[in-house]
């Protein structure tokens, strides 16, 4: 969350600006925009990938649009090449939200390397964890320097206890960093282990009655296998299944709720009904 906020501030996002976000994501994505007093514009999702729907973006772009935040949901990469083409044509920043997708790739190119900035989460349930905290990447040294200044109270690196701007206390502790670095040393092994589990689930669930969709599988993408996802037929009660799994010691959870259905975020969509995100939330 702080990484998203920091990148937005470093890019100069402010009151009066608009930032396009997908309707299905953890609330941190839209909250970071609101922290900047900017206006989030909620976008429909793709029915297959559950990521931001590229075909819906153009109609949401206005003269006030300054950034798009694609979220690689549950480790599934967005259609980044198409999105980058739109953003470059309109001179709009792209901030990749890779909170759930460290290790995911498109044609062997890692997510987080397409946009102007990208953010990663090291929360306790993530593939790499430091308990809390995250990471931000930048492809512009000037923006990187600004973010580095802002994360440490805006304190000048040339004059001790001199503050050129109002900054934040967004520093990761050395202990947290050490925990994260130790995991990065066996990163490939961690991903491989998770993908083995995914393959096991795929074999067990493939063709089973009541399961409409397994995690998307495409030759040109690598899913980092963060969370295994299922779409259930409407005759299966999702919440009852979650409770039955819990009784068996198996943790499961519903998908994220549609942002535009929740009180703090109503009014940030240009459409009355976002059919794909509404359907996913209910399944």
What residue spans do the PLM features occupy?
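Glycine-rich phosphate-binding loop at the start of an alpha helix
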Residues: 1, 27, 51, 77, ...
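Short, conserved alpha-helix that lines the donor NDP-sugar binding/gating region
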Residues: 4-8
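PLP-dependent aminotransferase-like
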Residues: 9-98, 105
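Histidine-centered beta-alpha loop that forms part of the nucleotide-sugar donor binding/catalytic region
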Residues: 24, 38, 45, 99-100, ...
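PLP-dependent aminotransferase class I/II
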Residues: 55, 67-71, 76, 80-82, ...
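Conserved active-site segment immediately N-terminal to the catalytic lysine
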Residues: 96-130, 159-164
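Active-site PLP attachment segment
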Residues: 113-155, 174
């Amino acid at each position: 969350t702080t990484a998203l906020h920091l990148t937005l501030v470093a890019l100069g996002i402010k009151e009066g600006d608009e930032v396009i976000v997908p309707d299905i994501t953890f609330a941190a994505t839209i909250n970071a925009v609101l922290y900047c007093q900017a206006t989030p514009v909620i976008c429909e999702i793709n029915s297959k990938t559950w990521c931001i729907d590229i075909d819906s973006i153009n109609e949401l772009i206005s003269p006030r649009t300054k950034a798009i935040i694609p979220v690689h949901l549950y480790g599934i990469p967005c259609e980044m090449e198409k999105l980058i083409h739109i953003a470059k044509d309109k001179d709009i920043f792209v901030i990749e939200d890779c909170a759930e997708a460290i290790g995911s790739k498109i044609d062997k190119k890692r997510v987080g390397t397409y946009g102007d900035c990208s953010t990663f989460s090291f929360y306790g349930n993530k593939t790499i964890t430091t308990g809390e905290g995250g990471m931000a990447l930048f492809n512009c040294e000037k923006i990187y320097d600004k973010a580095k200044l802002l994360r440490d109270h805006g304190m000048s690196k040339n004059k001790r206890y001199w503050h050129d701007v109002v900054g934040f206390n967004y520093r990761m502790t050395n202990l947290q960093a050490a925990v994260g670095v130790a995991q990065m040393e066996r990163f490939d092994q961690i991903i491989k282990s998770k993908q083995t589990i995914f393959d096991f689930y795929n074999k067990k669930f493939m063709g089973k009655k009541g399961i409409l969709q397994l995690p998307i599988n495409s030759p040109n993408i690598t899913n980092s296998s963060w969370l295994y996802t299922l779409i259930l037929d409407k005759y299966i009660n999702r919440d009852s299944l979650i409770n039955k799994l819990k009784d068996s010691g198996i943790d499961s959870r519903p998908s994220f709720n549609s942002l535009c259905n929740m009180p703090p975020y109503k009014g940030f969509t240009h459409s009355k009904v976002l059919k794909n995100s509404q359907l996913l939330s209910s399944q």
